Amino acid sequence: MVMDDEEMLRSLTSSQLIMLGHEPILVADGEQAINRYQELQDRGMPVDLVIMDLTIPGGMGGEEAAGTLLQLDAGARIIVASGYSNDPVIANYREHGFCAAITKPFDLAELSRAIESALR
């Protein structure tokens, strides 16, 4: 699952994930991510990995959404993504419940490494 408020970034990340052999689900904010994650989980189709934008102007961002997802599923694997490399959440991502962090913009190799790290 990819959560980002910018449609262009969702689309780009989706294309990268497809190249890496994944089937992405796209959502625009934390509320959509939580609802879709729960819906899929209830249908027996668990989400393997979520990539969450840290900051969603006017909506629920990655930190809050990750906390809720981890309450629903303690085994959720979540990567935090941000354009702000000096953000304390990026620097200390594990303390905030994330499995990996990636700074935007990222290329295919960086995304692949973050996914490998998160799924370990």
For every predicted segment, state its role:
Residues 31, 35-38, 63-76:
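Short amphipathic alpha-helix used as the core "switch/output" element in two-component signaling
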Residues 14, 88, 106-117:
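C-terminal output helix
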Residues 3-5, 27, 50:
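Conserved sequence signature across two-component system core domains
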Residues 68, 93-101:
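As written
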Residues 21-36, 102, 114:
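Short hydrophobic/Thr-rich beta-strand motif most characteristic of the beta2 strand and flanking loop
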Residues 53-54:
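Active-site residues of response regulator receiver
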Residues 11-19:
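Charged docking surfaces used in two-component/phosphorelay signaling
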